[in-house]
Each structure stands twice: as structure tokens, then as C-alpha cells.
Amino acid sequence: MKIYFKNIIIFCLICLGSFSAFAQSNVVNVYVWTAYLPAEVAAQFTKETGIRVNVSEYDSNETMYAKLKASSDIGYDIVFPSSYFLRRMRQQNMLHAIDKDKLSNFHYLNPALLNKDFDPKNDYSIPYLASITGIVVNSDYIAPKSVLKWQDLWREDFKNGLLILDDMREVFSMALLTLGYSINDTDPKHIEEAYLKLKTLLPNTKIFNSDVEQNIYVDEDAVVGMGWNGDINLSQADNPKLKFIYPKEGFVISIDCLAITKKAPHLENAYKFINFLMRPDIAKKISLEIGYPSPNLGAIKLMSKELQANPLFNPDAEILKRGQIQNDVDEVLPLYERYWELLKIGS
């Protein structure tokens, strides 16, 4: 009787363990920027595959990085780092190498956005969306053709009128470009020069903001300044007078990537979800809802001719040539941060 009872217990434990493993294997855990993965996309994946998508959100690369750095066994399968953080995470062995043979939709990606310095062979990253930083003007107040360069923001008639992004790297990149330097410059003298240049922009600066810059432009609390192409693309529905300009000196291209964590607990599901996100019809849906250009050429082909001709959705090769990919500047980051603090307090 004892043996019989013992066998029942063992059988139950085996069944319970198998059930638990099955339940855990039928999910993929995603850690993504706030409002950056449409709910209907996750729902469609679950409907097609039976794999549930658990979504957690973060508001900055720093938050995501710190959480993964604190515990490599935190349970996330997929993260969405921006290009410059992807490089840092790759170098610190925080990511799983990607087997492209498991991604049948990889060939749809735009070659112009592949093989960049932050991940030379895309062994650790898949482009998700591309963000470009440029100049925003309201054509009711300012002729768009009169503001074609970053340097134009220093005009005297823009005194106390600019919206400047509350983003250290973006703002220093703007100044470095006006001086003819790389946005990833690590020369302390050049960084100081950029800081001094930005100090002269303070009289023209009305507000530093990155959180609700769309609302500020739509409500016309600022009619000229910096902005991201995707945000302005969506804002034009509420205020069609908003125009986005790709500055002549160049601009920042930030690629938000899909990456697999080093200890992804549901590796095969991660591959399935990433491949699903690269499917042209899904990539199109994401781009239209989020507002940023898709790196997926198959998705662009599915869009209307009007959207294909829209440089906010589909910047051409000539435009992209002027862009620079944001990379990690870890070795001089404290210097950038010190000058940024001084700039924000107006000294």
C-alpha cells in the first residue's frame, strides 16, 4: 500500500512538473519601450501560434539596461535596445547570438540599415524601427524653406521660441554637427566646443522637453525646434501645418532593435516572435501605428503610393546618406553628462 501510494505521488509530481513546463514554454516574455508594440500585433501572434506574449514596458534605455544588468535571470526573452545601448550590451555579453537561419523574413530588411558599427554583422540585433531627429517648424508662422540647417536655430528672431529635446545625446549631436564633427565624437576639446556652442543657444530656448513634445507642437506652444520624425508624422493628423526637415549638416539616426537576452528562457518562442514581427504585413501595421519608418522593405511595398513617397515614412537613400548612427560613447560619457548638467542650469 505504501509503495502504491508512493508511486501515485511520484506520478502526480511528474505530471505537475510537465504541466508547469508546458505552461511556461507557451509564452514569450517581451521587455519593450512604452507603447511601442501594438496590442493587436501581440494578440495576432497568440492567435496564430498559441504562444502568449507577456509584455513589460520601460521608458528609457538606462532603465532597461539597469534591470537586465542587475539580474541576468530576470526572465525576459526579447528586449528593444537602441543602437548605442545594443553595442554596450553586446560587448558586455548580455545578449544571445542570433541564428539567422531561424528567421525566414530577415531578407526583407533594408540593407542600408544593416551591418552598422554597433553590430557589424547583425549577429545580435534585428532593426525594428528607425528614428530620425530633425527640425520641426509650423508653416503658419515660419517658412519651412527658411530653416534648412541646424545652424538656423541660432537665428536672433527665434529668441525664447525653441523646443529643444530633453535628451543629452540628441542635443550635443546637433551642436557637433554644426561644428562639422561626428555625433559620436569622443575628443574632449570637441565636446567642450559643442557645449560652448549650445550655451549660445540658451537665449533662444523656450523649453527642454522630450515627453510631450508632440502636444507642445500641436498646441503651438512652440512653433520651431527639434523633434523626432515619427512623433511629427503622427502629430500632423492634429496639426497639418507641422513640417519636418532633415537638416543639411546631417542628423541622428537611432535604430531601435530586437535582441534576445543571454539567458532567454523561451528561446525558440523568441525566434518565432521576432520572425513574426519581420513579416511585411505585421511590420507595416507596426509602422503605421507607431509612426516611425520601417526598416522592412517588404512592409514599405505594401503601403500606399502616397506613404511610399512620404519621406517621414520612407526617407530615400539620398536623405539617409546624411544621417549618422548613434553609437556608445561610454569612455567620455561622464564628460558629456557634466556639460549637460551645466547647460540645463544655464551656466
Residue ranges and their predicted role:
Residues G134-Y141, L177-T178, I255-H266, I274, ...:
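A bilobed periplasmic-binding-protein/Venus flytrap-type ligand-binding module shared by bacterial periplasmic
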Residues A23-R88:
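Early extracytoplasmic/lumenal segment of secretory-pathway proteins
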Residues Y76-F80, K206-I207, V223-W228, K243-F244:
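Paired acidic/hydrophobic, glycine-rich loop segments that form the ligand-binding mouth/hinge
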Residues T261-L320:
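Mature extracytoplasmic/periplasmic domains
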Residues I191-T200, Q236-K262:
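Periplasmic-binding protein-like
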Residues F85-R88, V218, V223-K241:
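A ligand-binding cleft/hinge motif common to bilobed small-molecule-binding domains
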